Amino acid sequence: MRNLPIGVFDSGVGGLTVARAILDLLPHEPLYYVADTAHFPYGTKSIAEVRQYGLAVLDRMVADGVKLLVIACNSASSALLRDARERYDVPVVEVIQPAVRKAVSATRNGKVGVIGTPATIASMAYDDAFAAAPHVDLTTAACPRFVEFVEAGITMSDELLECAKEYLAPIVERGCDTLILGCTHYPFLAGAIALVVGDEVMLVSSADETARDVYRVLVSRGLTRPASAPPPVHRFAATGDPEPFSRLGRRFLGPEIGHVTTL
């Protein structure tokens, strides 16, 4: 069990931000990353659709063998986390609570913004997560096209900046000093987002906090791979055409991505 990989799941390349954080924190651990590109994007689909597609992929990953699952997708975390934790014997880590914890501790004026896909914002998953911090003044905003820009390999352009100004207007007007990037694709757009909201606003990505959660769970359950073990072998797969994911993945993650298989 200790030598099985950590499973990381997303609809596309966004979860690679989480994968990178896990690789940096746990370099001895192998990863099994699956992108459900056949059903991308999740952010514009209904909760029922995301649950159906996501659980089908997670079923396959568990059958293939993983010691822990990371749902590295905010839309999927909000739609199927409870089902996944009831369905599988392996621990399941998600990305919403880690980001909320970090934002609550980071805000200075108590005004926190959350941006995400339409599905994530409509689910009110972040509203529910912040219920335990009633002193926080929360502002949420959907950013429908951000994921499309990332999946097209665009991280800075005039069109992107115009979209960002429109989407982020409620955050700026409210005076939020902390902004949760509530989609794992969004850290790739951090430069454009910072240009709009200003350098004084702290951008919170769930990636590093999620990696720490993975570490804590592995240690508490005795699932860490021995440091003396051979170098890990990572596996990457896509449910759709693997070529676009492979091309973008190498750009965003680096040489760790080798051959991408079709799931």
UniProtKB/Swiss-Prot annotation:
Signal peptide as annotated in the record: none
Record's catalysed reaction(s): L-glutamate = D-glutamate
Its EC number(s): 5.1.1.3
Keyword check for Isomerase: yes
Pathway: Cell wall biogenesis; peptidoglycan biosynthesis
Active site: C73 (proton donor/acceptor), C183 (proton donor/acceptor)
GO molecular function per UniProt: glutamate racemase activity
GO biological process, one term: cell wall organization
Binding locations of substrate: D10, S11, Y42, G43, N74, S75, T184, H185
InterPro entries for the chain: Asp/Glu/hydantoin_racemase, Asp/Glu_race, Asp/Glu_racemase_AS_1, Asp/Glu_racemase_AS_2, Glu_race
Domain of life assignment: Bacteria
Class of this enzyme: isomerase
Keywords assigned by UniProt, alphabetized: Cell shape, Cell wall biogenesis/degradation, Isomerase, Peptidoglycan synthesis
Function, in words: Provides the (R)-glutamate required for cell wall biosynthesis.
Family: Belongs to the aspartate/glutamate racemases family.
Protein name (database record): Glutamate racemase
The organism of origin for this protein: Acidothermus cellulolyticus (strain ATCC 43068 / DSM 8971 / 11B)
